[in-house]
Amino acid sequence: MKKTLTTIRRSSIARRLIISFLLILIVPITALSVSAYQSAVASLDVQMTQSAKENVQILDHIIDDKISTTEKSLAYFSDWATAEKFQDKKKTELKQEFKQFIQMNDNVAAVFSSGKDGDFTRYPYADMPSDFNALERDWYKEAMANKGKTIVTEPYESISSGKMVVTIARQTVDGSGVVAIDMKIDDLVTTAKGINIGKEGYAFILSQNKKVIAYSGEKAGTELKGDWVDKLYKDKSGDFEYTYKGKKKKMAFATSQTTGWKISGTMYANEIHDAASRVLIMASIVLAIAIGAGMTAIYFVIRSITKPLRRIVASAEKISEGDLTETIEINSKDELGVLSESFNHMAHSLRSLIHGIKDSVEHVASSSEELTASADQTSRATEHITMAIEQFSNGSESQSEKIETTTEQINEMNDGLAELARAAAVITETSADSTEVSSKGETLVQKTAGQMNTIDHSVKAAEQVVKGLEIKSKDITNILRVINGIADQTNLLALNAAIEAARAGEYGRGFSVVAEEVRKLAVQSADSAKEIESLISEIVKEIHTSLNVLQSVNKEVETGLVMTDETKQSFKHISQMTNQIASELQNMNATVEELSAGAQEISAASNDITAISKESSDGIQDIAASAEEQLASMEEISSSALTLERMSEELRDLTKQFKVDK
C-alpha cells in the first residue's frame, strides 16, 4: 500500500487527476451497488422466508381441518358405539354407519372398531391375517390408555390395503372398546408436493417421531436423521439455516397443535443470491456508463489544466539553465494565471539579487585575503608557547599517574584483605553450625534406624496375618462347596418328593406345596453359596495382592536399614572434617587481621602523595589548555579566512552563469 501511494505521488498531475476522478466515480457507485445488492438479498431473504412460513401455516390449517373434521366424526362414533353395538345382532347397524361415513368422506380409507374381547368390525371388509389381533395394535393400546382423548398414530402401511395411512382412534364413552378411522395421506402428500417455495423449494410433513408423512423423494414412514432434523424438533416453530448434500438451505417450520406433526418449508439459499444478482448486473452497467461519461469530461478538464502548466514548466527550465530574462504570457485570471504572474515576479527578483551578489563578492574577496595573512602570523607565535607548556605538563602528568596507580593498588589490596577477613569469619561460623547440624543429623539417623526396625517387625507380622487369612479363606471355600452340594441334593430330593406327591393325587397336594417350598429354599441356598464363594474368591485374590505388597515393602524396609547405616557413618566423617576446618580457619583469621592493619597505613600515606601531585598537575594543565584554546582559535580564524576566500571565488564563478540583461 505504501509503495502504491509513493508511485502515485511521483506520477504526473494528469495521471493523479485521472486516478482521483475515477475513485470519485467508482467508489460511491460501487458502494451503492454493493449496498443495493445486500439490501436486495436481505429483502428477498425476508420475502422468501415469509412465503415459506405462510405456506407452512396454510398446510397446517389444511391438516387441522382434516383432522378436526375426522375427530368430530370419531367423537360421534365413540358416543354412539356402546357395548351393545359390538354384539353380533347389532354389527349390521354398526357397519351401515361406517359405510355411510366412508361414502361421505373420500379421504377416509376405513372405519373399524374393536371391543375388549378383540371382536373386530371393519368397513369396507378386508381379509385380515390369521394372526391379526386388534388388542395388540398400537391404535387400540394408545386409545385405551388415553381415555376421553383422540389419538393420532404414526404413519404406517395398512395390512388390508397396503397403502400408507394414519389411524385416528378414540375410546368409547362406556369404555367397552375403541372406534378408529384410517385416514389416507395421499391427498396430504399431493398438497405438500404442490407447494413451491421459490424455484426449487418445497414443503414436507413429519410425524412426532421424525417419520415421513409427506416428503419429496422419501417414502412415507421412513425415519429421517441428521443435525437439521434435531434442530427441527428442538423448538415448536421458527426458522434456521443448514447444509443438505453440500448445499446451503433455509427452513421455516411449525408444529401442528392437533397432531404434533412438524410442518416445514425449505428452500435453497442460492436462489436468493441468484435473484439479487440482477440488481448487481444493473449496477455494473450504470457504473460502466458513468465511467465512460466521466472520462470524457475528465479529458477536457485535465487538458485545460495541463496546457498552461506546460508553458510554466518550459519557462522554469530556461531559468534553471541561467536565463533570468524569460517571462510567461498571461492569458487567464484563474489560479494558473496567478501562478504565471507570480513566476514573472520571481524572475525579476532573481535578476536584482544576482546584481547585488556580484557587487558583494568583490568586496568579500579583498577582505578575506587581508584576514588570512594576519591569522598566519598570530598562529605561529602561539604554537611556540604551547609546545613549551606541553613538555612540562607531560612530565607532571606521568608522575601523578604513577602515584595514583600505586594508591589504587594498595586500596584494592586493603579491600581484598578486609573481604578475606569477613569471609573467614563467616566460614568459621558456618563450620560451627555444620558441626552442630552434623550431630543432629547423626542423632536423627539413629532414630530413623530404630523406626525402620520397628516397621520391619510390623510388616513381617502383617505378612503372617495375611497368610493366615489366605488359609482360612480356602477353608471357607471348601465349606461353601459342601453347602452347595447339600443344596443341590436337597433340590433333587424336593423334586422327587413333588413327583411322589403328584402321584398321590389329592392326598399329596399339601406335601407337594411343601416340597416346592423346600426346593425353592434349596435353590436360594445354592445361589447364596455360589455368591459367597465368588466373594471369597475375590477376597483370596485381594489377600494374594496384599501378600505380594507386604513382601515388597519388607524388601524396601531392609534396603532402607542398610542405607540408614551408611548415612550414619557419613555424618560421623562430616563432623570430624568440620572440626578440623574450624581450627585451621581460626589461625588464618589472625594472620589476615595483621596484614589488613599494615595495608591501611600504606594506603593513607599514598593518598596524601596523590593529592599533592594532583594539585600541581591541575595548575599546569589549566595553562596548557588555555594556550591550546588560543592556538585552535587562531587556526580556525585562518581556516575560515581561506574558506571565505575560496567561497567568494566560487560565488563569482556562479554569478557569471546567469543572464540578467537582454
Swiss-Prot record:
Modified residue annotations for Glutamate methyl ester (Glu): 370, 594, 629, 636
Topology in membrane: Multi-pass membrane protein
Pfam families (UniProt xref): dCache_1, HAMP, MCPsignal
Extracellular face of the membrane: 38-281
SMART domains with a match to the protein in the record: HAMP (SM00304), MA (SM00283), TarH (SM00319)
Keyword RNA-binding applies: no
Source domain of life: Bacteria
Membrane-traversing stretches: 17-37, 282-302
Family matches, as PROSITE patterns: CHEMOTAXIS_TRANSDUC_2 (PS50111), HAMP (PS50885)
Domain Cache span(s) in chain numbering: 152-228
Role according to the record: Chemotactic-signal transducers respond to changes in the concentration of attractants and repellents in the environment, transduce a signal from the outside to the inside of the cell, and facilitate sensory adaptation through the variation of the level of methylation. All amino acids serve as attractants in B.subtilis, they appear to cause an increase in the turnover methyl groups, leading to methylation of an unidentified acceptor, while repellents have been shown to cause a decrease in methyl group turnover. The methyl groups are added by a methyltransferase and removed by a methylesterase.
Protein family: Belongs to the methyl-accepting chemotaxis (MCP) protein family.
Name of this protein: Methyl-accepting chemotaxis protein TlpA
Organism phylogeny: Bacteria, Bacillati, Bacillota, Bacilli, Bacillales
Gene (name only): tlpA
